[in-house]
């Protein structure tokens, strides 16, 4: 069994589409996939989008807070408590199965408080002893944001499973073209996929075919080897 956490260098970088794409690619290789969203704020759109695009039927949100804000703010305004991160970890382990892949999509970036006592997705990764896949962009500023996220993982010895560019335009500008190259060369961390802008608007069968092309099959298979 394998647990892989998915985070972003910020919010809105394409974590959900990246999670769906990796899930779809794994399903097409015959891998049993579960997707978990430990914390959702606002509506439950992310889980529904992952299920729609990937075809994965085991998609679970552990807790949802009503307003689309940072988890601690949304929980506070609703008069609700944040879950303990060890509770989250226990629930995630219970979802995992032998020979299966469990993808855990975080909320916002790596150090967003999503559990009680200020705990973050990084803390959850440490409890689970699981690697983290980092979704980033090719936009101006991404090299700094990516470096900060990778450094935050490294300082706690949390392994990084690679980078994914969550949305790359069909007609990139100069900064986007150069950043795509620099993301691949600057950090010593492999870029696992570059997802075309607008991929989420594809019909699910087309999205699944694209996903197979985006991720190296050997890497995907190796996640549960």
From Swiss-Prot:
GO terms for molecular function: ATP binding; dethiobiotin synthase activity; magnesium ion binding. Substrate binds at residue 41. Gene3D superfamilies: P-loop containing nucleotide triphosphate hydrolases (3.40.50.300). One of its GO terms (biological process) is biotin biosynthetic process. The keyword Cell membrane does not apply. Mg(2+) binds at residues 16, 46, 105. Homodimer. The active site is at 37. SUPFAM superfamilies: P-loop containing nucleoside triphosphate hydrolases (SSF52540). It is found in: Cytoplasm. Pathway: Cofactor biosynthesis; biotin biosynthesis; biotin from 7,8-diaminononanoate: step 1/2. Its cofactor is Mg(2+). Its EC number is 6.3.3.3. InterPro entries: DTB_synth_BioD, P-loop_NTPase. This is ATP-dependent dethiobiotin synthetase BioD.
């Amino acid at each position: 069994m394998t647990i892989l956490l998915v985070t972003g260098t910020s919010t809105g970088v394409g974590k959900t589409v990246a999670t769906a794409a990796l899930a779809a690619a794994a399903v097409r290789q015959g891998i049993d996939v579960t997707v978990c969203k430990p914390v959702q704020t606002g509506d439950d759109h992310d889980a529904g989008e992952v299920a729609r695009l990937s075809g994965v039927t085991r998609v679970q949100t552990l807790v949802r807070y009503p307003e689309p804000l940072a988890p601690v703010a949304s929980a506070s305004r609703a008069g609700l408590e944040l879950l303990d991160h060890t509770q989250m970890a226990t629930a995630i382990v219970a979802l995992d199965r032998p020979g299966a892949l469990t993808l855990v999509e975080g909320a916002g970036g790596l150090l967003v408080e999503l559990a009680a006592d200020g705990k973050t997705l990084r803390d959850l990764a440490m409890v689970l002893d699981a690697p983290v896949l980092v979704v980033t962009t090719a936009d101006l500023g991404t090299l700094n944001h990516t470096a900060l996220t990778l450094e935050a993982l490294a300082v706690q010895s949390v392994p990084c499973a690679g980078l994914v560019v969550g949305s790359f335009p069909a007609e990139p500008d100069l900064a986007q073209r150069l950043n795509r190259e620099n993301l691949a060369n600057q950090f010593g961390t492999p870029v696992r996929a570059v997802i075309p802008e607008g991929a989420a608007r594809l019909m699910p069968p087309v999205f699944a075919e694209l996903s197979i092309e985006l991720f190296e099959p050997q890497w995907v298979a190796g996640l549960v080897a």
